[in-house]
Amino acid sequence: YCDGYEVLTSYRNSKNYGDNWISAGYALWFIRESRYLNNARMLMNTSCAVSGTGFFFSRKVIESAGGWTFHLLTEDSEFSVHQILKGQKIGFCAGAILYDEQPVTFRQSWRQRMRWARGCLQVFRKYGVGLLKGMGRGSFSCYDMSMTVLPAFVLTVGLIVTYLVVATVTAVDGIPFWPCLIYILRALFGMYQTLFIIGLFTTVTEWDNIYTSTGKKIWYTFTFPLFMITYIPISVAALFTKVKWKPIEHHRADRKVLETAAGRSGK
């Protein structure tokens, strides 16, 4: 705030990384987002983006917006896009760490990520024209946010359409299905490899910020791509499903994680 930022977001960490592959998948993605998206944006002197609830804004910001008027399914993304279109630059404070609690069941995860997927569509529907105009004026932040809220759907739908076309042509022409299946499996394996490299790099560089055992850090690096690949059916379902906001229950207060983090920061 003293550096002139009216909006700041934090380093989004998690207190239950080691619960299972689902909580670890969330946690690793958010750590990557903090270190390699928002921190990179700060180094480039462009706007960051709010993620989750660990953020700060001045009274001036909320008054200029007429109160908290952001009620789409992904209000954090909506708030970020709104501020960027108003010319506000969002900052990132790496020393302000939020210890979030992540879902641990696939049912909870499906419901939450379905909301996020649908919410991103809502944000682009409401602010897409403004973002495109900003891109036309040379705004990197508008381009950045467009790539943040839209690509998952574009890539997913494109992938599904491609597979359906290939499968249809195969069936009509009487071509054996096995080559098509091999193509699909190769594509999925390529996705797995890319996501594994992303997860591995983040795990290695942010090792001391991940609060679980060494074995779990290593194991959940291998399950991270599987967690991310489940976004494909979720994204497709979000296109055709009416999604409502439902709370995700939180019950934990992992004092051990917080005490360990406090001890490390005091070194």
Ranges and model annotations:
Residues 1-72, 114, 121, 125:
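Long helical/loop segments within the catalytic core of UDP-sugar-dependent glycosyltransferases
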Residues 79-80, 109:
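Short, hydrophobic alpha-helical packing/hinge segments within bilobed ligand-binding/sensory domains
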Residues 157-173:
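Hydrophobic, aromatic-rich transmembrane alpha-helices
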